[in-house]
Amino acid sequence: REKLRTALAGRDEPWEAAVTQYPGHGAELARAAAERGEPVRIYACGGDGTLNEAVAGAAGFGNAAVTHYPMGSGNDFLRMFGPDACRFYDLRALLDAPQAPVDLIECNGRLALNVCSVGFDARIGLGAADFKKLPLVSGPLAYQLSAVRTIVQGIHRPYRVTIDGERLPGEAFTLICACNGRYYGGGFNPCPDAVPDDGLLDFVVVPAVSRLTILTLIGKYAKGGAGDIPRILLRRGREMHVACERADRINLDGEELVDSELSVRVSAKKVNFFFPEGTHWIPEKRVRN
C-alpha cells in the first residue's frame, strides 16, 4: 500500500487495495470490480497464480484491464517481454500504460493466460507442493524430490491427442503443452515464437521417450529449442483434446486441475492487459524479419 501511495501521489484517481484470503478470492475481487461497469485497472501483485486469478475475474469485461506487479518466484508470463520485463516493477510506468486485448486458454471450463500442460512437467511442478509440506523442505529441493519421484514412477503415460481434428500418432506421450505465452515452470521456454494475441495456441507434444533421453533433451527444451529436437510434434491451432487413461494432474498457469480428459481451446473471452510504454511481446525473430 505504501508503494501505491507513493506512486499515486499528486493524482486524483480513486484506488483501493485488497489482500486475497483464500484460493479463488482474487478472481472474485477482479470480477466484482469489473462488474461495476466503470473503467478499472487491476494490478495483480503476486506470482503467476495471482495473475491467473485476476485475469479469470476480468476476462470478457471490456471496461477492465489487468497487469502484473511481480512478487512471485516465477513471473513467467512477463518473461516474453525480454529485458523489459523488469519495467513491470516500476508502478509509475504502469499508471498510464497502453493496453491491448490478449487471448486466453480455456481448459475444462477454467481459464489460463499463459500455459496449460499435462504430463512429466506438470507432475513435477505441481508435485513439488507435496514435498513443501515436509519439514525443512522448500524451494529447489522440493522440485528435485518431485522430479526424482516422477522419474521413478515413469515419465510417459497413455494419452490420445487430437489437435484441430488431427489425431496425433502415438499412444503414449511424455508431455503435452498448450501455450499462449512463451515461458513456464520458472523459465522453461517451449514456444519461443508464441504470441498471446494471434487467436491461436502453440502446441508442443513430446512423444514417449526413455528416462535417459529426457535427461539429455531437457536443457534444449528449456532454452527454446523444442523445434530442433527430433520427433517432437509442434502445431499451431485453436483447440486440442487429450484423453488420459486415468486422472492426471493438469497445470494451468501453475494452478492444479485433476481430470482424465482435457478440452483445451482458445477462449471466446479476451482480457485487456496493460504494459509499460515501449515494451511488447513480439518475438525477436519477427522483429528482425
Regions found by a protein language model. Give the residues of each.
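Glycine-rich phosphate/pyrophosphate-binding beta-alpha loops
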Residues: 117, 121, 177-191, 256
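Gly/Ser/Thr-rich active-site loops/lids in small-molecule metabolic enzymes
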Residues: 132-142, 192-213
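ATP/nucleoside-binding phosphotransfer catalytic cores, i.e., glycine-rich phosphate-binding loops
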Residues: 163-165, 170, 195, 205-289
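Short Gly/Thr/Asp-enriched flexible loops that form oxyanion-binding sites at enzyme active sites
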Residues: 50-63
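ATP/NTP phosphate-donor binding region
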Residues: 1-42, 52, 280-289
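Short conserved active-site loop signatures built around small residues
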Residues: 26, 48, 176
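Catalytic core of DAGKc-family lipid kinases
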Residues: 20, 60-177
